[in-house]
Amino acid sequence: MNVSLLNFIVKMFEFLALIVVSLFSNFKSTIVEYTNVIGTNEVKDVVEYETVYKYNSKLPSNIERVVVEGVDGITYESNGETKVLVEKVDKVIEKGTGKYGEYTGALTEYGPDCYGCDPNGYTYCATKNGTWHSLTKDGIYYEDYEYGKVRILAAYTGEFPCGTIIEINNSEKDGLIGVVLDTGGGMINAYRTGWTLIDLAYESQSSVEMPINKKTSFSVKRWGW
């Protein structure tokens, strides 16, 4: 073999060996740096959130809702000191302890000019703030502190106290939310005979859309104010 060629091959092997050693050294250095970070500054510990139950007599016993979603916390060690990376947030579930709130019955509709209604359109119930609501002056909606803009309902207040929030579902009304602010003789008499009748307020008797729907479900979302 040519001596010059042999020397060239030897030099090439030495060069490749140097590259391999250099690469290994850099890789090893990277491993050491990573190990140091994990070992001293980035040792993380997950702190699992807990579930806290709160009981509310204003909610029907058939309702359970999440008030606050839970978030796991994260802590880490830095120079021997435990620090918080993410604060733990406990999950909060509200459970109803009030009366069971599912009913079936009939939905009727009425205007403030109905027979026997207050001539000024005032409802039977006072609002949460103690004021009086007029269907003719203030309209057929009420701004509830929890549910926002809702329709006004008339119901038997011995069963559905003033301020009760009800969701109405039937073939014409899908998920309508209303608040009990009124009552009437028809609701009282219906309850005494064993069935549920709730009246939905309209601007006038002439604007009533549907005289009666006897296949209506009523879901109480909150009992009273």
Residue ranges and their predicted role:
Residues 9-10, 22, 27-28, 63, ...:
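Generic low-complexity, intrinsically disordered sequence content enriched
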Residues 96-225:
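Solvent-exposed, well-ordered loop and adjacent helix/strand elements within mature globular domains
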Residues 1-32:
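Gram-positive cell-envelope targeting signals
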Residues 30-101:
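Extracellular modular ligand-binding repeats in secreted and cell-surface proteins
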Residues 3, 21-24, 77, 133, ...:
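Intrinsically disordered, low-complexity segments enriched in Ser/Pro/Gly/Ala and basic residues
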Residues 2, 7, 26, 36, ...:
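Detector for Asparagine
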